[in-house]
Amino acid sequence: MTLRQEKMPGGWAIDLFRDGRSISRLWIADRQMRIGSQPVKIGGIAGVGTDPALRNKGLASRVMEAALELMKREGYDASFLYGIPDFYHRFGFTTCMPQHSLEIETRRAECAQKMLKMRTAQKADYTTIARIYNRDSARRTASCWRDPKRWYGFPMGSGFGVPCKAHVALDHRDRVVGYVLYDDVDTHCRIAEVGGQSRAIFHTLLHDMARRAVRLRRPSLSLSLPPDHPFALFCRDYGCTDHTAYERNAGPMGRLVNLHNCIEKILPELAHRWRLFDREQVLAVRTDIGHFTLSWQGDTLHMERDAPRLAARLDQRALTELLLGYKTANSLKTNDQLAVSYTHLTLPTNREV
């Protein structure tokens, strides 16, 4: 068997070949993902698969291990995937994001007024849509930065392989000021993404969603939005139900790949999280993939690539959960995932959960 790694537009393809045929494979998608306001380079793993007749022989594990080695060599800071239960923890991945759904009854959404014009999104709108998304998500952890010059549009709806279509809201000068992304299916009315910032935009988008739900003859519509999203807050006036799911060792999972590079890139975010009256403290951290020490020099937060024995100890999975705001330092301590050598140490926490 031969392992091949091929650079593709936007990422990598890794295949295990036998007799000239791919028998196990995956893709790595290049992305820039925010931790707070700071982008880090991530590899999104997708399409992990082995031919049915050859499963349970460790082939997928070989491909996954090759992917992690490649990402470390190529300077990726972290990696994320949507995992099946009880498999990807073997490669250091941990569940680190919740899954959100907001549901509104169609009859209530019909009360929203149309204040702006709407039309189907066009390729010429992609630059503006990317800019709206980046503006709306500027401090939202786990959102991906979209390059307005290169972003090619929405690859899918609310899930992998789900077809999609987008509508845009226009102001009085016919400029795109908001958008909504639908699952392009007839079985449900699902909204995968919403962009925009004014009440007029939100009214218009909800009106458009209600029209689609009526056309599909669905009693309710659902949105893939966290409860603190501005549009989710707007929808409270119409009555809605929020559902948040936390998977066990499955679902949205991630891991750090290059610890020091990642921490260096997010120093401005860690400085933002650090309480002003704690700046005299030094934060030393020891993990299974490396150590680091954070300290203030004047008004600047610095990192050293080592840590003394007297340090906070946690593995990279727990650190991933902490950086993404999935768990707090206190919850990690309670679960024996974080050992703190001295009681007054305070780890900066994510305020953007």
Label for each model-derived stretch:
Residues 50-77, 83, 185-250, 331:
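Acyl-donor binding region in acyl/amide transferases
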Residues 1-57, 160-202:
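Conserved donor-binding loop and adjoining core beta-sheet/short helix segment
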Residues 343-349:
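Conserved small/polar residues in nucleotide/adenosyl-binding loops
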Residues 21-25, 29-133, 137:
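Active-site-adjacent scaffolding segments
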Residues 229-272, 279-283, 287-296:
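Non-catalytic peripheral regions of nucleotide-handling enzymes
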Residues 99-195, 199-226, 252, 256-277, ...:
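Amide-forming acyltransferase catalytic core, primarily the GNAT-like/NAT-type
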Residues 275-334, 339:
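Low-complexity, glycine/alanine/valine/leucine- and proline-rich hydrophobic stretches
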